[in-house]
Amino acid sequence: MEAGDIFPNYTGASIINLPASVCRWLAVQPFGAPPLAHDWLSNIPGQYDQVVLLLIDGLGYDFLTRIVAGDFSGVRGLEFWGDRFDECPLLPLTSVSPSTTCAALSSLWTAAPPLQHGMLAYEMWLKEFGILSNMISFSPASARSQTGGLKHSGFDPQRFLPLPTFGDHLSGQGVETIVLQHTSIARSDLSLMLSARSEVYAFRAGSDLWLSLAEILAQPKGGKRFIYVYWGALDELMHFYGPEDERVLLELSAFTLQMRYFLDKLPKQGKKPLMLITADHGQIHTPKQPAYDLRNHPQMANCLTIMPSGESRLPFLFVRPRREDRLRDYVEKTWGKSFPMAAAETVLTSGLMGVLSVDHPHRERLGDWVVFP
């Protein structure tokens, strides 16, 4: 962690500032972190009866600006993004750290940075259950094909977060909250954790998503609505094939054409809903390299009490007593400046993941050292 590093802007330019902004557009009481900074809010004036937030997992700002600039002009349909942003603002936001999906979505739904809601990473040490857990499947991190295994140890997804969720808040304000997610995750533990007090619609394909959304918007309203749409297919393909693989571009093209069909069919008269499009994070190409595989570094593994948690691009290290100097020397000699390390206490007070006291229970999930590959 050095001068010049880019931190999430939790005070007005992060995804955690979206809930309070949505509250402002719906004209209800704010929730959690402050709304987006005035420069951002001024681009979207007015108040609305319905707000739609579409989250496209993995569609980061850099990738989107390249699409808008025409870098992928050979892929039919993507020109829509450049055409649309002639009339709609494109505003850069920071995610959270770490920007992995479970941490970022938890921040979005609690309007709080990761240290406060406790979902710190994709894989996390949970002392209360005595396990290194995958925080998407909520099973042991080593159980590759299992989902929900943590429930056998008493885990309750609806009681795990220490903070209220956005759905809780909106329900108390008389706002109906609707969540549209793919059927494969619509009632997963992570979805149950985040979508409390929400009516969940499970879609099976992009066509199902857009037609269902159109039907929901056309339903008579008894009050105000917040509609959250999560689309994860792009991120899944990026993880398997890389962020600019042709499959990724074709999937986004098909999704864009269906979205365009939906937008063209919206009623031209009457009060229109506000539609926001955001992401939880972007992606960069990170090829597998044997030099970074911990199985090839037994000397480093011998310095640890458990295997690294966190995620590949932000590992948390739990170090055996009297092995810290040996660990740091090994990392420095093996990878040099490409793997800087910071003590967990430094991260706790830096603001990178929010701020937390060193004696808070969430502190134990961070380990002793954090690596920044």
Annotated model-derived regions:
Residues M1-P373:
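Feature captures the catalytic ectodomains and active-site-proximal regions of enzymes
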